[in-house]
Amino acid sequence: MVRSKQVGNHKSDKKKNISKLWKTKRRVKDLDQIHHDMKPENAKLLLNQEIDYQLPGNAQHYCLHCSRYFVDLKTLKEHFKTKVHKRRLKQLREEPYTQEEAERAAGMGSYIPPKLINVQTQDTMEMS
């Protein structure tokens, strides 16, 4: 008898549901893409978007760190207090993986540990 893939409560790699890992419908941006979005010139564009009626809140309330749109300013401010947002800030503290770091890991240079970046929650602008 063949053993089937177990899908349990604990989060070890053996027990994860493989089909859920490959689904791309609700896939969020990777951390290096969010670091790119956090640069001042890109952040300004994302936080001051034109009105888009297809997105929640007409694309006016956007969390830069989680890459999510919210319905209104109150919901966005509540999101800043959640565990999900705080976890994402903690993940973003480590600087993104670069080609130079990959070359050092392959033996072409000495290892330099990744630096920690100070990441703070974005400012919310009150719209009147």
UniProtKB/Swiss-Prot annotation:
The protein is largely disordered, with the exception of the zinc finger domain. Keywords: Cytoplasm, Metal-binding, Nucleus, Ribosome biogenesis, Zinc, Zinc-finger. Coiled coil: none annotated. GO terms for cellular component: cytoplasm; nucleolus. Disulfide bonds: none annotated. Associates with pre-60S ribosomal particles. The gene is znf593. Involved in pre-60S ribosomal particles maturation by promoting the nuclear export of the 60S ribosome. Negatively modulates the DNA binding activity of Oct-2 and therefore its transcriptional regulatory activity. This is Zinc finger protein 593. Its main location: nucleus. InterPro entries: C2H2-ZF_Maturation_Protein (IPR051879), Matrin/U1-like-C_Znf_C2H2 (IPR003604), Znf_C2H2_jaz (IPR022755), Znf_C2H2_sf (IPR036236), Znf_C2H2_type (IPR013087). It comes from Xenopus tropicalis (Western clawed frog). A zinc finger (C2H2-type) spans 61-85. One of its GO terms (biological process) is ribosome biogenesis. Residues 1-21 are annotated as: Disordered. It is found in: Nucleus, Nucleolus; Cytoplasm.
